[in-house]
């Protein structure tokens, strides 16, 4: 009897876990777009559109995924400053990236935690994702292998 009860409990728990959304953070749902509309990313309960809508050839077993985490404001500031230094070394147009990041840095509080979702595929070189700053502002993150950010805003439906 105990074994049957344990089995039923485990099956029920696994069913609940399998029904859980890949992205449980509802405030992040929607399409996020850069000011010039050159970059965008869409999130839903299934996760990032770049992963959800990828062709099957890009989703080979154990070679794709989504990682959801929370990053501290202090760590995010540090990561942005590191990307600014790298951009200064690599880019011809240093001013526009620096200005874009300068506009978002005041919104980041050191003691706050920010929602972060990254997706990667076997057919791409790196990862993409989103870090939500507030209800309407986020950073599109592109890693290949260095991290660079684009300020994106939530598009109205």
Predicted regions and their residues:
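Hydrophobic h-region of N-terminal signal peptides that target proteins for export
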Residues: 10-19
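Short, exposed beta-strand-loop hairpins at the edges of beta-sheets
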Residues: 129-132, 136-149
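Bacterial N-terminal signal peptides that target proteins for export
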Residues: 1-6
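Contiguous, well-ordered beta-strand patches that form the walls/edges
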Residues: 38-40, 55-133
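Short, well-ordered strand-loop elements centered on a beta-strand within folded domains, enriched
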Residues: 47-55, 83-84, 137-143
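Short, solvent-exposed loop/hinge segments that bridge or flank secondary-structure elements
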Residues: 22-63, 122
